[in-house]
Swiss-Prot record:
Record has Transmembrane as a keyword: yes
Highest taxon in the source lineage: Eukaryota
UniProt entry tagged with the keyword Oxidoreductase: no
Entry's family note: Belongs to the peroxisomal membrane protein PXMP2/4 family.
InterPro entries: Mpv17_PMP22 (IPR007248)
Ranges that cross the membrane: 51-70, 98-118, 135-155
Primary localization: mitochondrion
Role according to the record: May be involved in cellular response to stress. Required to maintain mitochondrial DNA (mtDNA) integrity and stability.
Protein name: Protein SYM1
Compartmental location: Mitochondrion inner membrane
Membrane topology: Multi-pass membrane protein
Amino acid sequence: MSSFFKFYKASLQSHPKRTNALTTGFLFGLGDIVAQTQFPEPGASYDPMRTLRPFLYGAVLFSLVGDKWYRFLSTVRLGRLPQAHWANVLARVACDQLIFAPIGVPLYYTAMALMEGGSLEDVRIRLSEKWWSTLLANWIVWPAFQLCNFSLVPVQHRLLTVNVLSIFWNTYLSYSNSTASS
């Protein structure tokens, strides 16, 4: 396992965007694989195109947005308090949960609906069905995790740390998306 982390760290230093894109895409896709195999729809078989959509979302969109977001959050600072001060960590978690989460949740459902060939009306329906319940679930899962992430993990590894928990979160998102009526 340590050789994997050495490889990952070297890749992150030499090709940060590519490494984040592939890692994030892989983990979003893995979440869908888990959702399809562990929570299958009755009578449905595994759909590789369904897995491709979250892979592309993670690799192309979320990896870029997430990396920039975590770099921005690392600069959030209250007055002259040290970066690691608990008040700054809480401010980062508050920004993450009150700014990014309400935008990130609909971004996912919008991207999935459009990649599935849905219309803007389909997007509207999916968001009206899923946005609030997913945001509430997000607020149950992520704040405590992000407190640890922002206080213990170096900024260049925060996206990977989030991506590890995201295997489970992405499984939930994929399952939730697959149960949308649109």
